[in-house]
Amino acid sequence: MTDVSRKIRAWGRRLMIGTAAAVVLPGLVGLAGGAATAGAFSRPGLPVEYLQVPSPSMGRDIKVQFQSGGNNSPAVYLLDGLRAQDDYNGWDINTPAFEWYYQSGLSIVMPVGGQSSFYSDWYSPACGKAGCQTYKWETLLTSELPQWLSANRAVKPTGSAAIGLSMAGSSAMILAAYHPQQFIYAGSLSALLDPSQGMGPSLIGLAMGDAGGYKAADMWGPSSDPAWERNDPTQQIPKLVANNTRLWVYCGNGTPNELGGANIPAEFLENFVRSSNLKFQDAYNAAGGHNAVFNFPPNGTHSWEYWGAQLNAMKGDLQSSLGAG
């Protein structure tokens, strides 16, 4: 076989793989970590509040689940996945997060809603199957919400953490990169950490279309727009290193263990995003970063059992890093 023939066959295989991923990925996203049955986990007796926080930038009140860690306590913002619901935050639906962090000295903040938003300020109205609305989630999380919590719930407005799974893992990194005084800690669990690269924009667009009928171009424009790299954690490593942001980065390899998550969508998705996490680690180390926990075990699927275990495991690190009393 000639070199030319080999190259043609190689490119053919790549095209087939890319096409298959483009077709399969949105459906898998819909199944893995998808919409859960409505009904929060938090047991009766926990001091969980259901707040309505005004958002002038979005023109409506935003529901926020909240548990106080005490006066002037630092906040941990728990951000939801691609299929975030409008009734409860996925962290409450799928994990006992409020229970784990009760009396921890940390205020737990769970914004509700934001399906397919990437917790970003969108260029255009977010128009999907349920109609159109304004998405200015970065403004909410970095200005409106911390100011409201400081004034109304005595939450420390700076020195917070952002923790996200899947879609929101990259969002947590970006919030910390551009708002280092507010977010000194970012946790990314099973996220695609190079969304601007390769087929990332196309696959994200397909997934967003499947999860609510949204368009990636309404969010960050075409793939050539600078907003894609602006919201790419790997591209923003220099900022994270310069800020000395504390990072907690987790990704499994698609192999289930005793925690569960043994289904093809969850296994495929976790394996799919793992390489971007390994590349992020290499780039972070090469940039001189030295304030991160990287956890890449030989197991773990794209499911809540593993994300909950990570949130529980990082509790001590969060308390130490944020100076919880």
UniProtKB/Swiss-Prot annotation:
Enzyme class label: transferase
Segments crossing the lipid bilayer: none
Disulfide-bonded cysteines: C127-C132
Gene3D superfamilies found in the cross-reference section: alpha/beta hydrolase
GO cellular component: extracellular region
Catalysed conversion reaction: 2 alpha,alpha'-trehalose 6-mycolate = alpha,alpha'-trehalose 6,6'-bismycolate + alpha,alpha-trehalose; an acyl-CoA + a 1,2-diacyl-sn-glycerol = a triacyl-sn-glycerol + CoA
Region (Fibronectin-binding): 98-108
Keywords, alphabetical: Acyltransferase, Disulfide bond, Secreted, Signal, Transferase
Record: active site: S166 (nucleophile), E270, H302
Presence of keyword Acyltransferase: yes
EC number(s) stated in the UniProt entry for this protein: 2.3.1.122, 2.3.1.20
Ligand binding (substrate): L82, R83, S166, D194, F272, V273, R274, S275, K279, H302, S303, W304
Localization of this protein: Secreted
Pfam families listed in its UniProt record: Esterase
Recorded GO MF terms: diacylglycerol O-acyltransferase activity; trehalose O-mycolyltransferase activity
Residues in the signal sequence: 1-40
Family note: Belongs to the mycobacterial A85 antigen family.
Role played: The antigen 85 proteins (FbpA, FbpB, FbpC) are responsible for the high affinity of mycobacteria for fibronectin, a large adhesive glycoprotein, which facilitates the attachment of Mycobacteria to murine alveolar macrophages (AMs). They also help to maintain the integrity of the cell wall by catalyzing the transfer of mycolic acids to cell wall arabinogalactan and through the synthesis of alpha,alpha-trehalose dimycolate (TDM, cord factor).
Protein name per the record: Diacylglycerol acyltransferase/mycolyltransferase Ag85B
Organism: Mycobacterium bovis (strain BCG / Pasteur 1173P2)
